[in-house]
From Swiss-Prot:
Annotated binding of Mg(2+), by residue: 89
Annotated keywords: Hydrolase, Magnesium, Metal-binding, Nucleotide metabolism, Nucleotide-binding
Source organism per UniProt: Helicobacter hepaticus (strain ATCC 51449 / 3B1)
GO molecular function terms attached to this record: dITP diphosphatase activity; ITP diphosphatase activity; metal ion binding; nucleotide binding; ribonucleoside triphosphate phosphatase activity; XTP diphosphatase activity
Secreted in keyword set: no
Cofactor(s) the protein requires to work: Mg(2+)
HAMAP family for this protein: Non_canon_purine_NTPase
Name the UniProt record assigns to this protein: dITP/XTP pyrophosphatase
Amino acid sequence: MVIVLASANQHKICEFQAMLKNVKEKVKVYAYGELLETFEIAENGNSFKENATLKVKAIYQALYTLSQSTMQENIRNLFAQPLAIIAEDSGLCVPVLNGEPGIYSARYAHHKQFASMQYKNTDEANLYCLLNALTHCAPTPAFFVAHIALIFIKPYFCTYTLPPLEQCVIEHFEGILNGEVINEMRGNEGFGYDPLFIPAEHNPQSLTLAEFDMSAKNTISHRKKALSQCINRLFDKS
């Protein structure tokens, strides 16, 4: 089976690849940028589900176009195997902030027109934007959401070309990690809002996700929960 990750986010790709390393079946995992030129995908949906769907459709359509053209044999052979395209959209939701950052998690500082020029990268700007919003209400309950959209092409379809998108079924999986956000950053691991989020599960020391090592984080994360459902479904189908 070939799995194509519909993401150009290196942090997410690394997490997905680590989670898929111990899959019992033989699986080849590619970031879509290993097969295609990366391109901008408009994430203008109103929910994590809509954004994940936009991503999986965009990457599938690009792969479909590639499958119709003359290409190298090693690329053509990918389409002769069971093929899964996995897209994910995720974010942090804080109920006291009306669910924000939510679907704007990756661009929260920009969404809030927060002065971000003084920060070294987008993650840092987003963190300080959230800290600013939490000034009078942290610690407070919060949760991470990961939504996965899956397109799976069965082996008998895979004859060097792919079927049109209209013939594909998109399936959905969601994982949630409950916890709370605090008003100080702790830890140097992970990415995104990990330094502010304390998960409620398997965390007797009240560590932030940024204080977990990757292997420990990947046993409880929202992304792991959604991906586990997706992988179980893939092996049911294959």
